């Protein structure tokens, strides 16, 4: 893949991670959630080192509403929502391994119930990214 003046960019890199949870967790807890997700992105999905872009948002109880029993999964107030926007192209098996790695990591390190880990992957074409400078770094220059 020719990326113009950014030859080291990989087509599958650049996840943007949004983490939403109820307010009241410590800074250390929120930081650990971000680190666990980042490690799973590195280890399972092959995201390059330092490709870390996360937005962690706390919400009041009225600002985070969800069905507590949808699909037979019993969620508590500790439920966290992970929305990860990333380039298209990963297999279903790889995605399933990623979901498991995140849920396992959050359970093992933070004692978060696996039922309280809600993950949504949003896949986009590579031209939908601008890392700054008003440029689409994954797209070959047309000039």
Regions found by a protein language model. Give the residues of each.
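Interaction-mediating elements
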Residues: 13-143
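Short, Lys/Arg-enriched N-terminal segments with co-localized hydrophobic residues
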Residues: 1-13
């Amino acid at each position: 893949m020719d990326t113009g003046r950014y030859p080291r960019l990989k087509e599958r890199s650049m996840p943007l991670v949004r983490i939403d949870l109820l307010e009241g967790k410590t800074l250390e807890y929120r930081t650990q959630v971000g680190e666990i997700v980042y490690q799973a992105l590195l280890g399972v999905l092959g995201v390059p080192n330092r490709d870390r872009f996360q937005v962690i948002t706390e919400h009041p109880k009225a600002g985070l509403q969800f069905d507590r029993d949808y699909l037979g999964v019993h969620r508590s107030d500790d439920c966290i929502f992970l929305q990860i926007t990333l380039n298209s192209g990963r297999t279903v098996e790889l995605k399933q391994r990623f979901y498991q790695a995140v849920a396992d990591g959050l359970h093992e390190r933070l004692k978060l119930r696996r039922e309280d880990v809600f993950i949504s992957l949003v896949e986009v074409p590579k031209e939908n990214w601008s890392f700054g400078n008003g440029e689409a770094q994954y797209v070959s220059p047309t000039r």
